[in-house]
Amino acid sequence: MAVKSKIKYPQREALRMLLALEQQIDDLTAFESETEYTVGALSTDRYAQFRAKSGEIYTLSIVVKTRVDNLQGGPDKELADRFDRSVVNAQRLIIQASLRFMDVLSKLDVLPLGAREIFTGELRSLYDARERLRDPRLAPFIDDGLEKKIGVAEAVLTTIIEKAPQLMSFTAA
């Protein structure tokens, strides 16, 4: 659903912000492709860096969406489609990184200290990504590969839950 605002933005401002969003997604793509996920202090920090950067992208996407949805002169389908494509690309990247990291966790015989926090964060992240991708505006930009990655991520989460069901204990301690 479009975010309606009394403020109208010049197209050049929306485009400038969209370019910044696309650049951040490109930078995060490079960062993620250079990251080798293993479990240990340094790798966890590296993944935390990825998560922080993806959070910044999400925040910027809110700002960009407000501008794209409230242009002076009315809607611009090309700009809106470009924004929607960027959102899908960001979600694809986040799901891919989550998959890589969860795969590492699922292969461990014993989960590391703090695994509950990591796991619950990944579960939230996967859920949020899936919910964002359910926006009908994004459907034209979602391919079968992304749908498959979401299914794989859910399977990996199931493996982790089966390996350590205590991670999902929600009773008061």
For the regions a protein language model found, what residue spans apply to each?
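Long, low-complexity or tandemly repetitive, helically biased scaffold regions used
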Residues: A2-A173
